[in-house]
Amino acid sequence: MEGQPKLLLSPPQIKIALERLACQLLERHLDFSETVLIGLQPRGIAVLQRLQHILSEQYHLQNIATGKLDITFFRDDFRRNDTPHRASSTELEAPIEGKKVVLIDDVLYTGRSIRAALTAIDSYGRPSEIELLTLIDRRFSRHLPIQPDYVGRQVDALQNDKVTVNWKELHGEDAVYLIKDTHE
């Protein structure tokens, strides 16, 4: 059973976090000529699109190479569920060989999705460097030694609690919620 959602980030707080993340990317990657930003399907895509919009509108950076990476068949729990996973498409606008790649997701939890992304990205080339950007870092929940390079907000939550990210385009509001597990 789940408890009442607790608001962790409001729309203005999400906006500030995304703008800060965009600035950090800009500091590290300058004109992005050697960088490919890749959102993990499905939930990292909204973060990628928001960052791309900020970089385009506020910093006039056009033609940033982006991509969408599906990790469905690379997950270690792929065959463990009764219901089949629904795969999304992988779309890379530019080759990643020798480029700096920034993997983007909404919530970093156990690290298993990122491990799957690292395996999946090998199918498309060998980047010179891979970084990780996440809007929310559940820092004490890792099963694997994976740490983000860019973090919007760190959240401490119990193992069975859920952190959900809502986007205006998909859910009618920008918000991040913590939903406590009320099982005893």
Place the predicted regions along the sequence by residue:
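PRPP-associated nucleotide enzymes
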Residues: M1-E184
